[in-house]
Amino acid sequence: MIKAPVVDDRPATIFLICLFYAVHMVEEFSFGFVEWGDRYFGSFDWTQNLIGNSIFFVCVALACYAYYKNPVKYLWAGMSASMWILANAFLHISATALGGEYSPGVVTATFIYVPGGLYFLNRWRTRGLLTLQNIIVPFFVGAMLFMLVPTFARAIHFHA
């Protein structure tokens, strides 16, 4: 019998990303993300925000669950969730810096998403798993497919 590599001796910690997301949503919902998003990304309302965040939350939770059940097979899913929160943080921080106004969500993005995402990447790095081969798919799935491309496509489509 071949011994499988240990990717993570505490795979349940990946669910912290779901907690990070929930706290981030509280900041966004409480401090006017929809109104801010309407100005920056065009034609944005509460229904779209709730549907979009529900879809994102389900995808992140499923990625975390898959990783939890089988970290070896679904390392890419755990890494994708981590890349997703880092990409979201990048958008909030850059929008605040470039727009010169508070982007609802930037506080949790800066103080929870960035350290949280880096925490997981560092855990994988210490196990020798943070290789170019291992991060290409998670970067494209988590950062590009689920965050950056839809955000910029929406802004271009609505001429925001």
What are the language-model segments listed below?
Residues 10-17, 73-81, 131-136:
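Membrane-interfacial loop-to-transmembrane alpha-helix junctions, especially the N-terminal start
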Residues 26, 30-51:
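Interfacial loop at the N-terminal end of multi-pass membrane proteins
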Residues 52-66, 85-89, 113:
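Core segments of transmembrane alpha-helices
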Residues 45-58, 101-115:
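Membrane-interface loop-to-helix entry segments
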Residues 124-142:
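Interfacial loop-to-transmembrane junctions
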Residues 148-160:
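Juxtamembrane boundary at the C-terminal end of a transmembrane helix
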Residues 71, 93-104, 158:
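Membrane-interface helix caps and helix-loop-helix hairpins in membrane proteins
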Residues 80-92, 105-123:
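Hydrophobic alpha-helical membrane segments
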